[in-house]
């Protein structure tokens, strides 16, 4: 049975500061408004790892925690009740979780570890519908193969500033593209928002696009 246009939501709240996620939503033709953490929120605390936590469990737990935090933010702020989209991305190699580097030295160490090897990029996506129900989250898993890299190439890339603020210390859509020999999975998932999974969740939440 088709859903009438009157029952569709005109936009979704995006609980993310990532420019890449905003670009990807625009690619789908999804209208959105940002729902960002308040100054008094400790958003970074949500991304803290638990002892012994594996990457797949970690990224899904953090995504769900972000979803609950975003819903609480919406209610506390008195915003109109609309669905909320959240996502979390991490990189994993050797069972280690590589999140956002804390500084240039950390970025250099991460990229040195990835050089010449395969790793996984995991992006979990969740939607809280307008009634406040968390829909089943989706997980995108992609494998990425990096070329062997000399230390000087890594230093030049780190000096560009691009690695900071990105899981695994690189952006697939930026200068790091020259390092990537092979991808098995979702390019948009590696960017931070897998469009196949996200579109399905947004349609389930009755977003008009």
UniProtKB/Swiss-Prot annotation:
InterPro entries cross-referenced by the UniProt entry: ITPase-like_fam, Maf-like
Protein localization: Cytoplasm
Organism domain of life: Bacteria
* Catalytic center residues: 88 (proton acceptor)
Q: What does the record give as cofactor?
A: a divalent metal cation
Any single GO BP term? nucleotide metabolic process
Enzyme class, top EC level, equals: hydrolase
Keywords on record: Cytoplasm, Hydrolase, Nucleotide metabolism
Concerning Pfam families, the annotation shows: Maf
Annotated GO MF terms: dTTP diphosphatase activity; UTP diphosphatase activity
Tell me what reaction this enzyme catalyses: dTTP + H2O = dTMP + diphosphate + H(+); UTP + H2O = UMP + diphosphate + H(+)
**At what residues does the UniProt record annotate the site feature described as Important for substrate specificity?**
20, 89, 173
Q: What is its EC number?
A: 3.6.1.9
* Keyword check for Magnesium: no
> What cellular component terms from Gene Ontology apply here?
cytoplasm
The UniProt entry's sequence similarity note says: Belongs to the Maf family. YhdE subfamily.
Question: What is its biological role?
Answer: Nucleoside triphosphate pyrophosphatase that hydrolyzes dTTP and UTP. May have a dual role in cell division arrest and in preventing the incorporation of modified nucleotides into cellular nucleic acids.
Q: What protein is this chain from? A: dTTP/UTP pyrophosphatase
Instruction: Give the source species.
Output: Paraburkholderia xenovorans (strain LB400)
């Amino acid at each position: 049975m088709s859903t009438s246009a009157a029952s569709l939501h005109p936009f979704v709240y995006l609980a993310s500061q990532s420019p890449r996620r905003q670009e990807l939503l625009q690619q789908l033709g999804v209208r959105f408004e940002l729902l960002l953490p308040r100054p008094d929120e400790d958003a970074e605390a949500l991304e803290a790892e638990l002892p012994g936590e594996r990457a797949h469990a970690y990224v899904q737990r953090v995504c769900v925690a972000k979803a609950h935090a975003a819903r609480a933010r919406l209610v506390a702020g008195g915003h109109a009740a609309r669905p909320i989209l959240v996502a979390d991305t991490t990189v994993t190699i050797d069972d280690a979780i590589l999140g956002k580097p804390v500084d240039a030295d950390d970025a250099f160490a991460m990229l040195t570890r990835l050089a010449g090897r395969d790793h996984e990029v995991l992006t979990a996506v969740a939607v809280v519908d307008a009634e406040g129900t968390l829909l089943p989250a989706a997980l995108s898993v992609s494998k990425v193969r990096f070329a062997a890299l000399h230390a000087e190439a890594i230093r030049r890339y780190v000096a560009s500033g691009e690695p900071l603020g990105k899981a695994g210390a690189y952006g697939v859509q930026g200068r790091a593209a020259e390092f990537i020999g092979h991808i098995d999975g979702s390019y948009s998932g590696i960017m931070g928002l897998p469009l196949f999974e996200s579109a399905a969740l947004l349609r389930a939440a009755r977003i008009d696009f």
